[in-house]
Amino acid sequence: LGIEWSEYIQMIDEMSKLNKQDIIDFANKYYKDNYAVVYKEQGEDIVEKVTKPNITPVSVNRESKTDFLNSLLSEEVNEIEPVFIDFENDINYGKIDEVPLHYMKNFENQRFELTYVFEAGTNVNPVNKIAFEYLQFLGTDSITSKQKQEILYKLGSEMSFNCSDDQVKINISGLDENFEETVKFLENFLSNFKSDEEALQKLKEDILKKRSDAKLNKQTILFNAMVNFAKYGENSPFTNKLTNEFINNIQSIDLVNKVRDVYASKHVVKYYGPRD
């Protein structure tokens, strides 16, 4: 938001100092004719009345308690105390072949989560988002996309790809006993995935359909489009999108190359699991 942390945490205290007249003065000064109005007209909402069926009243004895409920209510429960992360001591830092590693031990269970973080979001290149959406539908020379999911299911693991405004994240998680096998499977997939024209066509259709629906969605218009416009003006992360024509004309080789370029770039590895 472009403000110092010390200012941010004092925001509530500063707001408590304001009175009614301060609000009135602010509104009179800034809320004039410099506003935008959005009208949305989408047909006529015709509501058909449905006859309500007769409902048989149910007699409920709210005073009656089972033995199980009594035993449950009699148990003493300790208050839950929050546990805060100590960034100095809880998170460890190291390197794997010059790749920065951030790791934290999981004391709760025998599950792990491993994430590769690349500073290559849509602000760097908007094609990256489509490329990594495409990647999740692909297989390799030896397995199909469906077989990929079956293998992960047998390992008790999950694999996901996410591209935000700032970062690309490649993530795997699952049972610690299958950690090595899951990592090897991920590395093999990222080195040997192959294009699928049918999957690409379906992805294009899905993206264009979501765009069309978003134009009619009040939540998207207000909390995404308008908020971004208020923060950044005409050029914002929300408007940093590929045209429909570009999407229709993009080729598999373009997306495959984007994934490989990102995967070969500088990144950070983050691990959370039971291993030291």
Question: Would you name each region that the model predicts?
Answer:
Residues 94, 114-116, 172:
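Preference for bulky hydrophobic residues occupying beta-strand positions
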Residues 77-110:
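N- or domain-start disorder-to-order transition segments that initiate the globular core
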Residues 2, 78-82, 90-91, 145-148, ...:
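Intrinsically disordered, low-complexity segments enriched in polar/charged residues with Gly/Pro
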Residues 107-152:
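Active/ligand-binding-proximal structured segments within catalytic/core domains
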Residues 41-44, 98-100, 106-108, 117-121, ...:
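Solvent-exposed coil/turn segments that connect beta secondary-structure elements
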Residues 1-74, 150-276:
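Charge-rich, well-structured scaffold segments of protease-associated domains
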